[in-house]
Design a protein with these regions (language model features):
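Hydrophobic cores of alpha-helical transmembrane segments in multi-pass inner/ER membrane proteins
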Residues: 68-81, 136-146, 197-210
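Terminal transmembrane helical module of multi-pass membrane proteins
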Residues: 148-227
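Non-cytosolic membrane-interface motifs at loop->transmembrane helix junctions
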Residues: 57-64, 120-133, 160-161, 186-196
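Select subsegments of transmembrane alpha-helices in polytopic membrane proteins
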Residues: 30-38, 134-136, 162-167
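Selected alpha-helical membrane-embedding segments in polytopic membrane proteins
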Residues: 27-122
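N-terminal juxtamembrane cytosolic/stromal segments of multi-pass membrane proteins
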Residues: 1-31
Length: 227
């Protein structure tokens, strides 16, 4: 079939559907582009809380381990962006290794900061609420950019890609959170700081899944209109 015998209506539909595309930047470069977000959470969270409540921040020696945690978050974001590209999905073994490394790093960097005195029962719930709310509030805007980058790549498993992005942003937030909440007991760190990360993982998975469903519905409506 050549152009001369293609039905005019079909030809117009195909021509309208053709749009120039731009190749995706590599997952690593897209993750690196979010370095300013990581720095903003690393510095902004403790500085905001110090300004708000006049708390003493962690010693400068502790900032190095937070930088390590923030750099790991970029690796996880790169994995999430790769997961979002059809045909480049991560194997289950790679996902397992990534999750284990993330958990081990979170436990290790926070193990160096716990207070020998712990938290009194009267303050436990208040500190829990403050840490979770602060981390999630600062991180939700930071999650917008990764969610948008995932949506551009047409993921086959949007929940997995979104969860990895949520994990990456959650570790970014914890890198800053631990610099002003550094004198709590280990149970507080695991429940409050770890809980904030899990909330962001869930939000990342949910947002990516919803975005793909909305895109799919829009495509169906567009196809129906053309038909």
């Amino acid at each position: 079939m050549n152009e001369s015998n293609i039905p005019a209506a079909l030809y117009d539909v195909v021509r309208r559907d053709l749009k120039p595309v731009r190749s995706l930047v590599s997952p690593e470069r897209r993750a690196l582009a979010l370095l300013p977000v990581g720095i903003a959470l690393l510095v902004g969270l403790p500085e905001f809380w110090s300004w708000k409540s006049h708390v003493v921040l962690a010693p400068w020696s502790s900032w190095g381990t937070s930088v390590v945690e923030m750099l790991l978050s970029l690796v996880i974001l790169a994995a999430g962006f790769r997961e979002a590209v059809p045909g480049r999905e991560l194997h289950n073994r790679a996902l397992t290794v990534l999750l284990c490394v993330s958990a081990a790093t979170f436990i290790a960097v926070n193990a160096t900061m716990r207070s020998p005195f712990g938290i009194s029962p009267a303050h436990w719930l208040r500190w829990l609420r403050e840490c979770v709310v602060t981390a999630v509030t600062f991180s939700i805007p930071a999650l917008i950019a990764p969610a948008w980058l995932v949506s551009r790549a047409l993921p086959n498993r949007p929940g997995v890609a979104g969860a990895l992005c949520g994990l990456g942003v959650g570790l970014m937030a914890d890198a800053g959170l631990r610099l002003f909440c550094w004198d709590g007991d280990y149970a507080h760190v695991l429940v409050a700081h770890g809980g904030a990360i899990l909330i962001l993982v869930a939000l990342g998975a949910l947002s990516a899944t919803l975005i793909e469903r909305i895109k799919s519905r829009v495509r169906r409506i567009g196809a129906t209109d053309h038909g």
